[in-house]
Amino acid sequence: MLEWKRVQVILIYQLFRKNMEDTFMVKITDDYKAKKEYFAKAGIKVPTYDQAEITKNTLAAPQWVHFGGGNLFRAFHAAIASHLIDAGKLNKGIIVVDTHDSSVISGVYNKFNNRMVRVITKADGSQDRELFASVAKAIYAGPATEDDSGFEALKKIFTQDSLQVASFSITEKGYALKDAEGNFYAPVARDIKNGPAKPENNMSLMVALLLARFNAGANPMALLSTDNFSQNGDKLKDSVMTIAKAWKANGFVNQDFIDYLTDENKITFPLSMIDRITPNPSETVSKALEKAGFEDYQIIHTPAHTNIAAFTNTEEAHYLVVEDKFPNGRPAFEDDGVIMTDRDTVNLADQMKVTACLNPLHTALAIYGTILGFKSISSEVQDPDLKHLIMQIGYGEDLPVVQDPKVLSPRKFIDELVNKRLPNPYSPDTPQRIATDTSQKMGARYGVTIQHYIDDPDRDPKDLNFIPLVIATWLRYLMGVNDEGAEFQPSPDPLWDDLHGQVKDIKFGDADQDVHEAVKGILSNKSIFGVDLYEVGLGSKIEADFKEMLAGKGTIRKTLEAHLAKESKDVE
């Protein structure tokens, strides 16, 4: 009898243990080595390296600092570091810095032990999940006038000779110092006046950190922008030098510091081209992770309107082309697929993507998608008119003037984008996300191609049809009224108030009104488009296209259909 009870107890225990294993929810902070099998049950690959050792090595002699801890960094840069560490080609991690949102550091990085799970969403519906523990430390460095603890921590890091690279993914507006009228933003103006002691703006912060490095021995390093716009390294350098020269004029730094920043044996600003569509965390991915047994599946919406999570979802295709100019050495980026090359090749690859083969198409879908009521990019490219539009822009107007960078094929790039990447329903990108900061993107997306048509004696910008149509549709977007005549919530844009203010009094439902006075300030603004659209012969065409879309409900769609029917080229 006692033996039977003993057997019963054992059976009950085994059943209990099996049930516990079947219902186990793995946490991102769990010991991924000890509980590797549980992560595997959730479909999550884990690293082989010891996070504590990597953190110790990093803090003792930092090698790589990254500014901008958002979803792109978590999906791409952190992956590169993790893979290099796992392969034994790097023994230090990344120190990540956020200057925008303290909640990202406290509520995501610190909370989850500086780890993240990257989910690659494939077109067949499958997912590749991988945990990264390559971030050694996460620092919030907001305005030092409010809290200088992050600034002081970074100064100690920047004085160490081991530091090789500071990389950036802070979006294009993160480098901007001036408003549309050419005036310094208020925090920048205060920084110029007050000097490097307690910087408010993130570019001022960067210069103050470089000053600390200069004063500690003037050791070399590279500042690598990996943001998605043309000549990103040059823009970073321009912003850094603008602050530095203003501080020299005000007596805060000397000429030796200026010389240090301009000596390419000391400080460099490599160019890069980056491409990986990384939208906000997806509810679909969140639910899949929950179902798989991953406990930290929740999406976090911070008070500063950042959407982030313990996971990040991204597409399978990815490209990073970098100018190989690192005066203090660098991690072996090429061993994880980064194309390291010369400046001219980066420029060509960047122009191919940013000005021709991806971003102009993306922005067109963002503008049209928002005012036509689409909620996903993938659903837009199922719409025959919108797919036809981006093919006309990409193959018909951009491809003829883009130079081949050789390391990537422009035509194959567009083919992959139009036929595989954009239609992927499991890559949950939205036109509303892509429409963010559109005013900062129009010059790169469309102005560069227009300039190519100006520069080529065998071409005429007046022969362009669909790029002007997209610009006209953007004017229509700036009214804040969709194709059904209802107001919509625009995506964040630093120039929205100004630009919307110029067109808000245009009457919806009247295609005969004179719009010139309302739109001329926008279309002639070289800081937006890179060219004066009237001077190059496109202003009147854009105005005419815009007026067609004012006639009433449905006229945005009707105007698009009419132009496609009349002006399309054979691009198959």
Predicted regions and their residues:
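Intrinsic-disorder-associated, low-complexity terminal segments enriched in Asp/Asn/His/Tyr and depleted
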Residues: 13, 19-22
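Substrate/ligand-engaging "lid" and interaction regions
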Residues: 21-572
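Low-complexity, intrinsically disordered or signal/transmembrane-proximal segments
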Residues: 8, 13-14
